[in-house]
């Protein structure tokens, strides 16, 4: 049984989610203790509990310690199975953080998987669903994955209630991806959406983003606005995407009470501008989230990023505990090169259990 100290590195929920995902994929039992020990509210929150339950359902796992505020769980995976699953978070907890754990496992199931997830689609301290759909998923698609996400209803803090349907086809091992050279910018797209808020807010958010990008020598910026998204409660978000030949860079911001709409749009614009100017092939958030997929590929992958977050460093450590993969991180001028090298032949004997 793997023993994982949940306080290691960044010591947050991502370590827990990735631990149970890797346990399910590899068939290794795991005990995770000191869960979220570095947070002001340690232990399992509802969204963490739902993520673990989602992975447990996909592999018929036997579990212990599965309750809110629990700081230790034991996860004993069984056989991976496809089918249709319902994963209600019950709060405004993030849908994308549940997907962060469940999607890699669904790819390994050997059968089609449909996941009906309810919760928060656009909440702070988590990737907005549109970032997951339009920045991260295209990268995973390029590695051979096939998944489709449909938003039936958006959900915001504090009410949640968003509804998302995710269809996944099995496809492990993934193809490696080489994003090891800076590329020219082909264009910038994006969109802003709001629900149950005055229309002027959406235009102020869009104008804030455009103002940040207007002095940047890029191709034309195509920004769409949507003011009638079906949702539970009030909220909104902006997503900006820079398109390169083989990769995308993303930046986003989620509306919050008391923060001017222009400032939120400008925040996303500044972040995207910084990513573009750095010459990175993946933005700092994609660099964090793509690591598990690189570890499940059939060959060497690499990318360039402007910063390696504590989440990413912790995930690299964790992946090397579960999988025969080695990561190499090197500083190259103002960029960081990350290289993932799986050290097994084709994954078949290891993953298809």
Curated annotation (Swiss-Prot):
Binding site for ATP: 100, 285-289
Catalytic activity from the UniProt record: a 3'-end 3'-phospho-ribonucleotide-RNA + ATP = a 3'-end 2',3'-cyclophospho-ribonucleotide-RNA + AMP + diphosphate
Family matches, as InterPro entries: RNA3'-term_phos_cycl_insert (IPR013791), RNA3'_phos_cyclase_dom (IPR023797), RNA3'_phos_cyclase_dom_sf (IPR037136), RNA3'_term_phos_cyc (IPR000228), RNA3'_term_phos_cyc_type_1 (IPR017770), RNA3'_term_phos_cycl-like_CS (IPR020719), RNA3'P_cycl/enolpyr_Trfase_a/b (IPR013792), RPTC_insert (IPR036553)
Pfam families registered for this protein in UniProt: RTC, RTC_insert
Keyword Cytoplasm in record: yes
Protein location: Cytoplasm
Catalytic machinery residues: 311
GO cellular component terms given for this protein: cytoplasm
GO BP annotations listed: RNA processing
Keywords assigned: ATP-binding, Cytoplasm, Ligase, Nucleotide-binding
Superkingdom of origin organism: Bacteria
EC number: 6.5.1.4
A molecular function GO annotation: ATP binding
SUPFAM superfamilies: EPT/RTPC-like (SSF55205), RNA 3'-terminal phosphate cyclase, RPTC, insert domain (SSF52913)
Role played: Catalyzes the conversion of 3'-phosphate to a 2',3'-cyclic phosphodiester at the end of RNA. The mechanism of action of the enzyme occurs in 3 steps: (A) adenylation of the enzyme by ATP; (B) transfer of adenylate to an RNA-N3'P to produce RNA-N3'PP5'A; (C) and attack of the adjacent 2'-hydroxyl on the 3'-phosphorus in the diester linkage to produce the cyclic end product. The biological role of this enzyme is unknown but it is likely to function in some aspects of cellular RNA processing.
Family, as annotated: Belongs to the RNA 3'-terminal cyclase family. Type 1 subfamily.
NCBIfam families linked: RNA_3prim_cycl (TIGR03399)
Protein name: RNA 3'-terminal phosphate cyclase
């Amino acid at each position: 049984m793997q023993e994982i100290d949940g306080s290691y590195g960044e010591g947050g929920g991502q370590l827990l989610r990735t631990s149970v995902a890797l346990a399910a994929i590899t068939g290794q039992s795991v005990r995770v203790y000191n869960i979220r020990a570095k947070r002001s509210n340690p232990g399992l929150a509802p969204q963490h509990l739902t993520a673990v339950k989602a992975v447990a359902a996909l592999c018929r796992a036997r579990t212990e310690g599965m309750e809110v505020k629990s700081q230790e769980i034991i996860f004993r995976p069984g056989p991976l199975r496809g089918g249709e699953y319902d994963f209600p978070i019950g709060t405004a907890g993030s849908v994308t953080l549940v997907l962060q754990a469940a999607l890699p496992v669904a790819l390994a199931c050997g059968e089609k998987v449909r996941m009906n997830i309810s919760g928060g689609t656009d909440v702070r301290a988590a990737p907005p669903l549109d970032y997951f759909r339009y920045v991260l998923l295209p990268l995973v698609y390029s590695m051979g994955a096939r998944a489709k996400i449909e938003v039936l209803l958006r959900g915001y803090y504090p009410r949640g209630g968003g509804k998302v349907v995710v269809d996944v086809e099995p496809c492990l091992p993934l193809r490696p991806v080489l994003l090891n050279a800076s590329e020219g910018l082909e264009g910038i797209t994006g969109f802003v959406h709001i629900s149950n808020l005055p229309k002027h807010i959406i235009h102020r958010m869009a104008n804030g983003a455009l103002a940040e990008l207007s002095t940047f020598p890029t191709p034309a910026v195509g920004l769409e606005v949507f003011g009638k998204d079906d949702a539970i409660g009030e909220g909104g978000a902006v997503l900006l995407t820079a398109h390169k030949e083989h990769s995308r860079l993303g930046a986003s911001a989620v509306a919050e009470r008391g923060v001017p709409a222009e400032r939120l749009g400008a925040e996303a614009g500044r972040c995207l501008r910084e990513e573009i100017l750095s010459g990175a092939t993946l933005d700092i958030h994609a660099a964090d989230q793509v690591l598990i997929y690189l570890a499940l590929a059939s060959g060497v992958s690499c990318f360039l990023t402007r910063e390696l977050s504590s989440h990413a460093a912790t995930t690299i450590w964790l992946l090397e505990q579960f999988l025969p993969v080695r990561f190499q991180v090197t500083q190259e001028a103002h960029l960081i090169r990350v290289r993932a090298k799986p050290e097994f032949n084709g994954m078949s004997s290891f993953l298809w259990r």
